[in-house]
């Protein structure tokens, strides 16, 4: 009986520890984005939307790379924004499609050429993260 209790406690502990990890892709609101930009934060921003085939293809690969390099990114889901917020984001970043990954430095995008647009493979993502200075290893 004691053995079963110990095993059960160990299993529960493992489940709790593995389930409490920080998510590599954190969905934020428009207000959260505004605060981060106004505070001149540096972060990775993914712009996505529900029903986007490219987003569905890209996100598992993107999350895998973020986890591999112990990085986090903020995600804005255009589908969950008001029409006004959506327009502001599209105008601010001149979004042509989703997913779009933007590298923000001190509240601004230093270069449009650093973006990741559309569903891209792991090597491409790693290269862009390297160019943006988030990882040292780039292929």
Q: What are these regions, as identified by a protein language model?
A:
Residues 21-23:
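Bacterial signal peptide processing site
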Residues 34-71:
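Local sequence-structure signature of Cys/Sec-based thiol-disulfide redox active-site neighborhoods
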Residues 1-6:
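Positively charged n-region of N-terminal signal peptides that target proteins for export
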Residues 102-139:
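Non-catalytic, surface beta->alpha helical segment in thiol-disulfide oxidoreductase systems
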Residues 16-19:
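C-terminal motif of bacterial Sec signal peptides marking the signal peptidase cleavage site
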Residues 47, 70-86:
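Thiol-based oxidoreductase modules, predominantly thioredoxin-like and allied folds used
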Residues 7-14:
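Sec-dependent N-terminal signal peptides
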Residues 90-104:
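Structural micro-motif
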